[in-house]
């Protein structure tokens, strides 16, 4: 794959549902802060040429052993992504949530390769639960929907333009690839059959620890 890509690693969320005095992305997982599990995985990928960590200033010291740039988080996730993009110097950017510790090298490569063809791509899994709309309550076809994760790889200028448009519309994005959708670009979904965990509740951390202790995740 002929690609040089930046990583924007999001570490600015507060995580009220996690019920912890510190943001969940800095909670220890098997001996090191949660966010560093993702950072280590991306550092090993040769096409990731630049890493921007979006975090509060008082957490920057945690990343001092690593060659990274910093950006300040915003009020919304999309504000944090846009802040990170101001430090990006490459034409392609991969966005990853700091609360997603499991990063699979082959999947990052597949997502980025797909983005090269269409302008935007996101990691996805098939819906395994019954999904219903709320108003009115209706059962949705599981084969017609997908669960979206990170990484998401997008052309840097497309992502910037989509984020600016969302801000002008006062529109809150659900994920990064939706910024491309606002511009009429259909993101490619790369489906995974592996565990995709976003640490949201304390119980999630216990599950992640069990997985890391018994399997080679990366």
Curated annotation (Swiss-Prot):
**InterPro entries referenced in this protein's UniProt entry, alphabetically:** IspD (IPR001228), IspD/TarI (IPR034683), IspD/TarI_cytidylyltransf_bact (IPR050088), ISPD_synthase_CS (IPR018294), Nucleotide-diphossugar_trans (IPR029044)
Keyword check for Nucleotidyltransferase, yes or no: yes
Record site: Positions MEP for the nucleophilic attack:
142, 198
A single Gene Ontology biological process assigned to it is: isopentenyl diphosphate biosynthetic process, methylerythritol 4-phosphate pathway
Reaction equation(s) it catalyzes: 2-C-methyl-D-erythritol 4-phosphate + CTP + H(+) = 4-CDP-2-C-methyl-D-erythritol + diphosphate
CDD domains in UniProt: CDP-ME_synthetase
List, alphabetically, the PROSITE patterns matched.
Answer: ISPD
Query: Is this entry keyworded Transferase?
Result: yes
Report which superkingdom the organism of origin falls in: Bacteria
Q: Tell me which residues are marked as the site Transition state stabilizer.
A: 17, 24
Q: What class of enzyme is it?
A: transferase
MF GO annotations: 2-C-methyl-D-erythritol 4-phosphate cytidylyltransferase activity
Family indicated by similarity: Belongs to the IspD/TarI cytidylyltransferase family. IspD subfamily.
Q: Which NCBIfam families match?
A: ispD
Q: What does this protein do?
A: Catalyzes the formation of 4-diphosphocytidyl-2-C-methyl-D-erythritol from CTP and 2-C-methyl-D-erythritol 4-phosphate (MEP).
This chain belongs to the protein called: 2-C-methyl-D-erythritol 4-phosphate cytidylyltransferase
Q: Which gene encodes it?
A: ispD
């Amino acid at each position: 794959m002929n690609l040089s890509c930046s990583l924007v690693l999001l570490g600015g969320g507060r995580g009220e549902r996690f019920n912890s005095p510190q943001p969940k992305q800095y909670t220890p997982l098997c001996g090191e802060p949660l966010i560093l599990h993702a950072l280590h995985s991306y550092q090993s990928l040769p096409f990731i040429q630049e890493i921007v960590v979006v975090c509060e200033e008082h957490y920057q010291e945690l990343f001092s052993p690593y060659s990274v740039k910093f950006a300040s988080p915003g009020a919304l996730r999309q504000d944090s992504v846009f802040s990170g993009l101001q430090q990006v110097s490459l034409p392609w950017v991969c966005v990853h949530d700091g609360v997603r510790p499991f990063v699979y090298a082959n999947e990052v490569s597949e997502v980025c390769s797909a983005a090269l063809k269409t302008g935007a791509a996101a990691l996805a899994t098939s819906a395994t639960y019954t999904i219903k709309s709320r108003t009115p309550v209706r059962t949705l076809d599981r084969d017609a929907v997908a669960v979206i994760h990170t990484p998401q790889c997008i052309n840097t200028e497309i992502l910037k333009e989509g984020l600016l448009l969302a801000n002008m519309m006062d529109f809150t994005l659900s994920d990064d690839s939706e910024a491309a959708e606002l511009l009429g670009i259909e993101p490619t979904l790369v489906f995974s059959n592996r565990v995709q965990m976003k640490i949201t509740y304390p119980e999630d951390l216990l599950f992640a620890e069990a997985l890391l202790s018994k399997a080679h995740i990366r």
